[in-house]
Amino acid sequence: MSAKDERARDILRGFKLNWMNLRDAETGKILWQGTEDLSVPGVEHEARVPKKILKCKAVSRELNFSSAEQMEKFRLEQKVYFKGQCLEEWFFEFGFVIPNSTNTWQSLIEAAPESQMMPASVLTGNVIIETKFFDDDLLVSTSKVRLFYV
């Protein structure tokens, strides 16, 4: 195992996504929240989110995570897949993570134009969000969450 692989393994072993919520960015109202560690690789996670989230112009995502390891430049790359085809790609950067710390990270996700939105009935169960967790250029983990609109 290379030093990079070992480092990625150490970061992943000491990393936990404690909770996450999604809010309507305009009103601040929580639309969905969960405590499952959606960062765990190797399994397809599921999230049931309300259909009305698709009507929001922007969604505020709040993540609370703990890390045993220091990270120089913690960041996420996310791809939204519909039936296997990538529709959107997002990039988020948190930056420096203190070792043995718990952090809350808020990000704004702007919606696609309304003309490009598909109805919840078409999207439900067919959307997968793939999240890659990085420390700078070191890939730490890849996780997948299948969305169901309820």
Curated annotation (Swiss-Prot):
Disulfide-bonded cysteines: none
Predominant localisation class: cytoplasm
Example GO BP: visual perception
Region span, Required for association with membranes: 144-150
Compartments in which it is found: Cytoplasm, Cytosol; Cytoplasmic vesicle membrane; Cytoplasm, Cytoskeleton, Cilium basal body
Pfam families: GMP_PDE_delta (PF05351)
UniProt entry keywords in alphabetical sequence: Cell projection, cGMP, Cytoplasm, Cytoplasmic vesicle, Cytoskeleton, Membrane, Sensory transduction, Vision
Keyword hit for Membrane: yes
InterPro entries listed in its UniProt record: Ig_E-set, PDED_dom, PDED_dom_sf, Rhodop-sen_GMP-Pdiesterase_dsu
Source organism superkingdom: Eukaryota
Function, as annotated: Promotes the release of prenylated target proteins from cellular membranes. Modulates the activity of prenylated or palmitoylated Ras family members by regulating their subcellular location. Required for normal ciliary targeting of farnesylated target proteins, such as INPP5E. Required for RAB28 localization to the cone cell outer segments in the retina. Modulates the subcellular location of target proteins by acting as a GTP specific dissociation inhibitor (GDI). Increases the affinity of ARL3 for GTP by several orders of magnitude.
Complex and partners: Interacts with the prenylated catalytic subunits of PDE6, an oligomer composed of two catalytic chains (PDE6A and PDE6B) and two inhibitory chains (gamma); has no effect on enzyme activity but promotes the release of the prenylated enzyme from cell membrane. Interacts with prenylated GRK1 and GRK7. Interacts with prenylated INPP5E. Interacts with prenylated Ras family members, including HRAS, KRAS, NRAS, RAP2A, RAP2C and RHEB. Interacts with RAB13 (prenylated form); dissociates RAB13 from membranes.
Family: Belongs to the PDE6D/unc-119 family.
UniProt name for this protein: Retinal rod rhodopsin-sensitive cGMP 3',5'-cyclic phosphodiesterase subunit delta
